[in-house]
Amino acid sequence: MRGAARAAWGRAGQPWPRPPAPGPPPPPLPLLLLLLAGLLGGAGAQYSSDRCSWKGSGLTHEAHRKEVEQVYLRCAAGAVEWMYPTGALIVNLRPNTFSPARHLTVCIRSFTDSSGANIYLEKTGELRLLVPDGDGRPGRVQCFGLEQGGLFVEATPQQDIGRRTTGFQYELVRRHRASDLHELSAPCRPCSDTEVLLAVCTSDFAVRGSIQQVTHEPERQDSAIHLRVSRLYRQKSRVFEPVPEGDGHWQGRVRTLLECGVRPGHGDFLFTGHMHFGEARLGCAPRFKDFQRMYRDAQERGLNPCEVGTD
């Protein structure tokens, strides 16, 4: 139930005119802004910091200046809210405890009514478009490794002064294996045997169960999968609750992207996944008989990463 979800790539536009110059063409504007922010320091950019969240307004800038503002957030989760966006923001995210960047995943979810700016992943001047202006699809989550870069938020040209707010929530999640990032970035791609075995040991939830119903929500570009669980291996949050009948089963709901095309099916599956922004997101989900085969093969070779019951 996991498939490659292609990320949109692109460069920011050039909303602010610059005088022509002879010789080689100047660098792209977003890269130029980043360089200026580093060179000018306090002279050409503002610096803001807060433990978890930041809220600011472009109205504090002089009308003729398109500033790049540095925002430093040192927390596991929070939000950024930028009213009347002008210029650009460089959002620096770090955990509030020591942890190597290569072990951290950043996930962002834009506000439903977010507009006025594009959100990019930036590293050494290269930009990858994460959330285009106005794409505030509810529930849409974008994730990347912290070592892949930082967030560059660039205001888009506007013809009026109507109120616009660019905003998003963020989470910093410690990942135990590289496969955890695949789960976030490619939730529809089928898992390999190794990924399944790691998922059952390291996911926020792992259960054996069947699909009772699937509710597609086009407005969220999401599908809600309603599960009946016969065996609960692990869960960090109360995703699954005992059924009212008290027959030893549990029930709960997990989510995945609409594009994965999940449908109700017969038989038991192993469902694994992680919590993001308070919701259970589906990761690896092989048929249970296939998981039994994977686990048995790994056990015979002494390669199973943890002990679980497969009866």
From Swiss-Prot:
Keywords associated with the record: Disulfide bond, Hormone, Secreted, Signal
Region (Disordered), start-end ranges: 1-24
A GO CC term attached to the entry: extracellular exosome
One Gene Ontology molecular-function label: hormone activity
InterPro entries for this protein: Meteorin-like
Bias-annotated ranges (Low complexity): 1-13
Tissues in which the protein is found: Highly expressed in the skeletal muscle, in subcutaneous adipose tissue, epididymal white adipose tissue depots and heart. Also expressed in brown adipose tissues and kidney.
Signal sequence, start to end: 1-45
Single GO BP term: response to cold
Major localization listed first in the record, in broad terms: secreted
S-S bonds: C52-C75, C107-C143, C188-C260, C191-C284, C201-C306
Compartments where found: Secreted
Physiological role: Hormone induced following exercise or cold exposure that promotes energy expenditure. Induced either in the skeletal muscle after exercise or in adipose tissue following cold exposure and is present in the circulation. Able to stimulate energy expenditure associated with the browning of the white fat depots and improves glucose tolerance. Does not promote an increase in a thermogenic gene program via direct action on adipocytes, but acts by stimulating several immune cell subtypes to enter the adipose tissue and activate their prothermogenic actions.
Family per similarity comment: Belongs to the meteorin family.
The name this protein goes by in its record: Meteorin-like protein
Species of the source: Homo sapiens
